[in-house]
């Protein structure tokens, strides 16, 4: 069973959804037969590098709310993260462009380090408050994932390397009508949108395992719940 996951490294629900999927796979009897592949998706391909404006300030400006209201909104997401053992430091996050991070993740996949790189990039942004567009930071992250500095610099210093791989992933998402992430595709036939509860993922895995081949392409197993996902404009805030 192959699961393809479209996500962005600055999408909080992508990290939460990743953890919930991992929990579901751990509970799944056929877990040894499950392969997970991460796909690139930029929430904002035109995003600038970090300018000093934090996530709470950016959110407040976007929605016309106070900083305190923005903080409370993010606290709700942080609570969901905590439920799966994650710590989100919204006060220190540095929103930025993620294209180079995606290129580096694509390279990591070619040397068998996709899983490690994906986790390190997400943790670096959400928990460690690192600037994941900065090349020095990316070199450091790659080293912790087991990739040599020289290899990383060879990718980062040539903006064409793995750029097409990222664009292909994004084009595939567009063809499927994906407008928000995380977005999960199982065996190129079934889809799950958003950071669904662990039990939803577990049931989906079991259903696909039992019914593989009997369902139409990209059958939606999200249960009608389209919340807990980020679009190219925002991460939805209930009531706004």
What residues fall within each predicted segment?
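Short, N-terminal intrinsically disordered low-complexity segments that are rich in Pro/Gly
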Residues: 7-10, 14, 45, 66-67
